[in-house]
UniProtKB/Swiss-Prot annotation:
Name the record gives this protein: UPF0342 protein YheA
HAMAP family: UPF0342
Family recorded in the similarity comment: Belongs to the UPF0342 family.
InterPro entries with a match to the protein in the record: Com_YlbF, YheA/YmcA-like_dom_sf
SUPFAM superfamilies xrefs: YheA/YmcA-like (SSF158622)
Pfam families: Com_YlbF
Domain of life: Bacteria
Ranges that cross the membrane: none
Length: 117
C-alpha cells in the first residue's frame, strides 16, 4: 500500500495545531499582542534577534556593542511575565518539532549512519 506522505504531513500539522503546546503558545502570543507595550517590546526583541542571526549567517562579525544591546534586550523581555512565558512556550514547541524531525530523519540516519558519530 502506497503512503501519501503529504496526507501524513497534514495530519501531523493538524495534530500540532490541536496540541496543548501549540494552544498555550497561541494563547500567550495573543496575550502579548493584545498588550501594546508588551507587543512593542517583543517585536524589538525579535528584530534584534533576527539582525544578529542574519549577520551570523552572512559571516559578518557581531560587535561587542551589538552583543551588549542584545543582552539588555533579553534581560528586559525576560522581566515581562507574559513575554517570558511566551518564550518558554516557543522553546517547548521548538523542542517538540526537533524531536519530530529526529523521528522523521531516522530512516535516513539508519541508512547512511548517524552524522553525530
Amino acid at each position: 500500500m502506497a503512503v501519501n506522505f503529504y496526507d501524513v504531513a497534514y495530519d501531523l500539522e493538524n495534530a500540532l495545531r490541536g496540541s496543548e503546546e501549540f494552544t498555550r503558545l497561541k494563547n500567550l502570543y495573543d496575550e502579548v499582542n493584545a498588550d501594546e507595550s508588551a507587543k512593542r517590546m517583543f517585536e524589538n526583541f525579535r528584530d534584534v534577534q533576527l539582525r544578529l542571526q542574519q549577520k551570523q549567517m552572512a559571516g559578518e562579525e557581531i560587535t561587542q556593542e551589538e552583543v551588549t544591546q542584545a543582552q539588555k534586550t533579553v534581560a528586559l523581555v525576560q522581566q515581562h511575565e507574559k513575554i517570558s512565558q511566551l518564550m518558554e512556550a516557543e522553546q517547548r514547541m521548538s523542542m517538540l518539532i526537533g524531536e519530530l524531525n529526529k523521528i522523521i530523519m531516522k530512516p535516513l540516519e539508519e541508512l547512511y549512519g548517524s552524522v553525530e558519530g
